[in-house]
Amino acid sequence: MVQDRKVLDALDTAKTQWYHFTAVVIAGMGFFTDAYDLFSISLVTKLLGRIYYFNPASKSPGSLPPNVSAAVNGVAFCGTLAGQLFFGWLGDKMGRKKVYGMTLMLMVICCLASGLSFGSSAKGVMATLCFFRFWLGFGIGGDYPLSATIMSEYANKRTRGAFIAAVFAMQGFGNLTGGIVAIIVSAAFKLRFDAPAYRDDRAGSTVPQADYAWRIVLMFGAIPALLTYYWRMKMPETARYTALVAKNDKKAAADMARVLNVELVDEQEKAAAATAAAAEEEAARREQYGLFSREFARRHGHHLLGTTVCWFVLDIAYYSQNLFQKDIYTAVQWLPKADTMSALEEMFKISRAQTLVALCGTIPGYWFTVLFIDIVGRFAIQLGGFFLMTAFMLGLAVPYHHWTTPGNHVGFVVMYAFTFFFANFGPNSTTFIVPAEIFPARLRSTCHGISSAAGKMGAIVGSFGFLYAAQSTDPSKTDAGYPRGIGVRNSLFLLAGCNVVGFLFTFLVPESKGKSLEELSGENEMEAEPAAATNSYRQTVPDSGQSE
């Protein structure tokens, strides 16, 4: 239908404006909160073990039993997976805006509830913590398809990749803030309630007030989400959803007039009657295939396979490293042995290590993607990222014993940081961006939800599997309660193999740089464009300014 074609053309050629940047902040703050909530748990798991699983007869500080640790670390991912599928589907059925506020409020409530976890026993506290973190993950899951879809549908085609990447890049600041908050909280508590090392005083090394420290860290995640709730509710529905799915061209153009300087003119009213028949015919053609149809499989089946597999294997590698950075640091002696520190000191040093990696390896990679994705393209960045991640992981794994010898620990951390850099300046960003671009509008949120859910399945495999796989091959050196594993070195080989799989499946995903969403999804092929309405719309800014 020509009206929505004109709406979409106006969106694709619209000049980059202030509202685009506002949308990045509004959508990006959700990802800031997402990253903070998902990664902050790794900063406090050692502290949880010391508080709730203390054994005065043990020579080592208390630690979470394997099943409890797996649940605490992985339950939010289970919720995220479910949320991605549910809210992705709901975003296509009800509209992006209507669902957007639900996810944010769920995140706020469950952030606060996680910090208020209660119970008369250690199991009780862990059970309530896991319950609230599951629903926290459920809300976080909804943010993935909705934020990506909203940003892709607002942006013009020349800078669309950079804007979606900027939304995702807020994860880096979420990680960094998680580390900074944990550093401040642990340092403040340590200053006020200093304690001896565990080997000097087993019971006294964990002060009772430490039970407040982890709660404060988890609850802080509610603040940025709460601050952006009002602005999310003020965002209009995306014009692409209104025009292509709700089929209300007049409202789509009116919404654009509010935020993107594009308005409806009287001629549209005159053209509406003349194009009604064409609109009905086109609508019927658009609805001729659904997600599970042969036509979808023919047009987009290989695309969906590529996006899901790439995100799945990427998250196995990415999240297993992120969640267990502290274990790798300990293995190379970058962190002191646990019994030489008090509980709060251990939390401080774990947080400091994660903050350093976020600052040096994580954040730069995200913003390199923002700068180069509309120049180099999605395909090249993803392919190169998988290749270099493989190379650096093999560089860590092959001479692993060299890296663990005295004097080489800094080199290990540098290599490890480069692995994160090329994950973020690579597939960790592009696997989020591409599914928001290549599928039809009526299935865009659903397909992004499916792709991101595959990623979270990989995160579950990484977070649960790595707990066991990375244990030492020497039974005497495993963590309490864990069976013998394959060791960190062999685990790195496995993760490198995952990256090779991602490299190969990248070839199923099309390049989307510089193309309109309708061109990528094939919706252009199904459009009838009556000549009578070619001038239905006009832009309020001069044509000469629409070069971005």
Curated annotation (Swiss-Prot):
SUPFAM superfamilies recorded: MFS general substrate transporter
Membrane topology: Multi-pass membrane protein
Record-linked PROSITE patterns: MFS
Functional note: High-affinity transporter for external inorganic phosphate.
Top-level taxonomy: Eukaryota, Viridiplantae, Streptophyta, Embryophyta, Tracheophyta
Membrane-spanning intervals of the chain: 24-44, 70-90, 99-119, 124-144, 164-184, 211-231, 304-324, 356-376, 379-399, 406-426, 450-470, 491-511
Tissue: Expressed at low levels in roots.
Annotated protein name in UniProt: Probable inorganic phosphate transporter 1-5
Polar residues composition-biased segments: 533-548
Keyword Signal: no
Gene Ontology MF terms in the entry: phosphate transmembrane transporter activity; symporter activity
Further remarks about this protein from its record: Although related to the sugar transporter family, it does not transport sugars.
GO biological process: phosphate ion transport
Domain of life: Eukaryota
Keywords, in A-Z order: Membrane, Phosphate transport, Symport, Transmembrane, Transmembrane helix, Transport
Family: Belongs to the major facilitator superfamily. Phosphate:H(+) symporter (TC 2.A.1.9) family.
One GO CC annotation: membrane
Gene3D superfamilies (alphabetical): MFS general substrate transporter like domains
Main localization of the protein described in the UniProt heading: membrane
Cytoplasmic side: 1-23, 91-98, 145-163, 232-303, 377-378, 427-449, 512-548
Region (Disordered): 518-548
S-S pairs: none
Localization terms from the record: Membrane
Extracellular side: 45-69, 120-123, 185-210, 325-355, 400-405, 471-490
Induction comment from the UniProt entry of this chain: Not induced in roots by phosphate starvation.
